[in-house]
A protein has these predicted regions:
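Short glycine/serine/threonine-rich phosphate/pyrophosphate-binding segments
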Residues: 20-23, 46-49, 76-77, 101-107, ...
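C-terminal charged capping/lid subdomain of soluble metabolic enzymes
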Residues: 307, 314-395
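Active-site segments that bind and position negatively charged phosphate/pyrophosphate groups
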Residues: 205, 209-332
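ATP/NTP phosphate-donor binding region
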Residues: 1-93, 346, 373
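Glycine/serine-rich anion-binding loops at beta->alpha junctions
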Residues: 91-107, 141-147, 279-282
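Short Gly/Thr/Asp-enriched flexible loops that form oxyanion-binding sites at enzyme active sites
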Residues: 52-53, 82-83, 102-116, 149-150
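A glycine/threonine-rich phosphate-anchoring loop and its flanking beta-alpha core
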Residues: 115-212, 309
Length: 395
């Protein structure tokens, strides 16, 4: 039965070619006069994108300060540095130029700049209630995290190797500028990591204990089919505007809540993946594809019909037996990941196969020392997470 829900998606989406030139206008519409720009590596500089955005701000007489250098698995220490600079500048809006790492960092800065005197990690760890944040705007350059429309952000505390998320509608971006052509220059690995992340944001909403939610199911299944088709096209030709457009829009819809309305989300694989990202600095999408198959084989027997439905609706598997269809669906999903040259076990990543004590340590961190259960399809503690890591711990 569909559960009660509240859907709030206030982000203004400006989608299409050359839309980055509208950044200044969108900021001006909000009555903002001082912007703090946040971005990652040199690609936004080399491509001329940053200059285009600055020009659009200049045309609207908007002053700005900037902070570049955001890294994948965005660091808490860097966000703290941004908070200090944004406060000193008197920023009124944080504008992220990049992918999920830049956007999540911007969200962290937006929280900190609106709450001077309180460390942002206090909000992340629920020690302080978040009541205000500066507005955030985004110019998307990587289709992946969906942070351009979501109410969540993830940062990593390098000192403790703790990768954690926060969720609040206060940090949903005011606008998202989405030009698929900006993704043409992505390294292939970034493209495929992003595709996996998009896929996982929906599949981890799809496998939950709540049934009888037809429209949400159809939206989720349609998104996954669309992504699978266009992933192959984009992998062959990254300048296929239609394919890159579909992938970019899938990324936003996959993580703005729509593919999981009326039911709880699982996101246990994200918990597993976050530990791999925090400890070994592995790419987020890779950590997800590396553990999903092991999770699926661990739980599918609890609801073979659900996995079989996924196999029939998403992979068009023509098999009447539910168990055979469920197993085939898991195999087809892993084949999809491998077709993108993404890992399907820990040994496929640079971290390699790990000793038992490392697996137990990560399982413990993911469950706060076995003090909480995670997931929704099956609630799990430290022991179960360790077993899934163990299943994935091979070459």
């Amino acid at each position: 039965m569909m559960q009660s829900f509240v859907q709030y998606t206030p982000t203004k989406v400006v989608f299409g070619k050359d839309t980055q030139k509208e950044a200044g206008k969108l900021v001006s519409e909000l009555g903002i006069t001082k912007v703090f720009l946040v971005y990652g590596g040199g690609s936004v500089i080399r491509s001329g994108l940053l200059d285009e955005i600055k020009k659009s701000l200049d045309e609207e007489h908007i002053s700005y300060e900037e902070l570049g250098g955001v890294k994948p698995n965005p660091r808490l220490s860097f966000a703290r540095k941004g908070v200090e600079k944004a406060i000193a500048f008197g920023a009124e809006l944080i504008l992220a130029v990049g992918g999920g790492s830049a956007i999540d960092t911007a969200k962290g800065i937006a929280i900190g700049a609106a709450n001077p005197g309180t460390d942002i990690w206090e909000f992340w760890k629920n020690k302080k209630e978040l009541k205000k944040a500066l507005p955030v705007g985004t110019v998307l350059t990587i289709s992946a995290a969906g942070s351009e429309m979501s109410n969540s952000a993830v940062l990593t505390d390098e000192e403790t190797q703790d990768k954690s998320g926060i969720g609040s509608d206060l940090i949903r971006p005011k606008f998202a500028i989405m030009n698929p052509k900006l993704t043409y220059i992505l390294p292939k690995y970034q493209l495929t990591c992003g595709i996996v992340d998009i896929f996982m944001h929906t599949i981890e909403r799809y496998f939950t204990p709540v049934h009888g939610n037809e429209l949400t199911d159809e939206i989720a299944e349609g998104l996954m089919r669309t992504l699978i088709r266009n992933a192959a096209k984009a992998y062959e030709n990254q300048e296929d505007y239609d394919a890159m457009s579909e992938i970019m829009w899938c990324g936003s819809i996959s993580h703005n809540g729509i593919t999981g309305l009326g039911r709880p989300k699982d996101f246990l694989c994200h918990k597993l993946g976050h530990q791999l990202g925090a400890k070994f600095d592995e790419a987020h999408g890779a950590t997800l594809s590396a553990v999903w198959g092991s999770w699926a084989r661990y739980v599918y027997h609890l609801d073979e019909a659900r996995f079989a439905n996924y196999g029939r609706k998403v992979w068009n598997i023509d098999e009447k037996n539910d168990e055979k269809t469920a197993v085939a669906a898991i195999e087809r999903t892993e084949e999809f990941f491998r077709s993108l040259h993404m890992p399907t076990c820990l040994g496929d990543m640079k971290m390699g196969v790990q000793p038992d004590e490392v697996l137990k340590e990560m399982a413990g961190k993911a469950t706060a020392g076995d003090t909480m259960k995670v997931g929704a399809f099956q609630k799990m503690g430290e022991k179960e997470l360790y077993e899934i890591y163990k299943k994935a711990n091979h070459r």
